[in-house]
Amino acid sequence: MSPNSKGVEILSIGTELLLGNIINTNAQWISEQLSQLGLNHFRQSTVGDNCDRIVKVIQEISKRSNLLITTGGLGPTPDDLTTEAIAKSFNVNLFERPHLWDEIKQKLPNSKLQDDSSSLRKQCLFPKNAQIINNPRGTAPGMIWEPIEGFTILTFPGVPSEMKTMWEETACDFIKTKFSDNYSFFSNTLKFAGIGESSVAEKINDLLNLKNPTVAPYANLGEVKLRITARAKNHLEAKNIIQPVKEKLKKDFSKFIFGENDDTLPSVLIRELTERNQTIVFAESCTGGLLSSSLTSISGSSKVFKGSVVSYSNELKNSLLNISEEKLTKYGAVSEEVCESMAINAKEKLGADWAIAISGIAGPKGGSQDKPVGLVYISISGPNNHITNIKKLFNSTRNRVEIQTLSVNVCLNSLRLILLSNSK
């Protein structure tokens, strides 16, 4: 867009979005597409299925933006009001496009459509000069329309698969031709584990003020992301802008950065073990198979992951992992001593290079003064009788799933660090 442009806005229409019944993935996806096109996307709005409210929002947006992209409200039901509201916003009439009705009838050949099927025919109504965006996956077309000079509206249905196809086949080229200035945004995301967002932010304070590239931290459960974004004409130019910042971060946070972009802790660990031609097994208690699932969700995990024992009860710890009743009684299932034995015995019984065992109290019940909710023991048994024991005490205000997920992340990252240390 030109330097004098006002920017782009996204308007998501649907009461179900306001009620939280569905997640608005459309706005996220469109935002990514706009960034790739280098467009200034400043605001997103959501409004329910109420014509007057939709009209008010559209009229407000038309005063401050060049391009409005709407999703939702194009279907045949009474609460699909987007096109009607757009027409009302600019005091114009809607006209039927007969060829669209013919297309709808062809898409629904087995239904008993009548020429007076007004609920479906409303999808054929558009302002006089609007350009139709064909919907090959559904019955609700969209439109490209410039109701006033300098302001364009693109409408899409709320079904993600339909919206994406219409965007890729029609809308993207239109937006690129009319609004893009040949600059695009390119991003590279570094992923951190074993360090909190505040600690990262404190150490990169100088980088947070950069204009091109920009550096922005984001936190997920047990993980921090740093997104480095450059505005450039092509990937090579962007890479040259991003690279110095990326190299500085890798130097300053060498052991904490585990990957980039689509990397995950499970995928990185699988890659590291594959490169070493090593295998791994698990002995899980408090995570109940979540650790195993984190690996098996990744394609190619069978090269390194042999299996696991989910020994939730003391009986199974005894019968499957040979943890003596005396040890269980003396130290308790949630203890370093028992967890270490679980790892050693799992490695021996299941025949792998590495074994990770985990035992803890995920809550919300079951804790005590000596062993509170959030207490987790992790043991890693490796080649040459290598043993690493880890004790973590997660905040007891976290819920059960959060404690389990954080525990899995610690397991994976701890072995990653061991492998990294061994390779030096």
From Swiss-Prot:
Signal peptide limits: none
Highest taxon above the source species: Bacteria
InterPro entries xrefs: CinA, CinA-like_C, CinA_C, CinA_KH, Competence-induced_CinA, MoaB/Mog-like_dom_sf, MoaB/Mog_dom
Pfam families in the record: CinA (PF02464), CinA_KH (PF18146), MoCF_biosynth (PF00994)
HAMAP family: CinA_B (MF_00226_B)
Family: Belongs to the CinA family.
NCBIfam families assigned: cinA_nterm (TIGR00200), molyb_syn (TIGR00177), PncC_domain (TIGR00199), PRK00549.1 (NF001813)
Identification of the protein by name: CinA-like protein
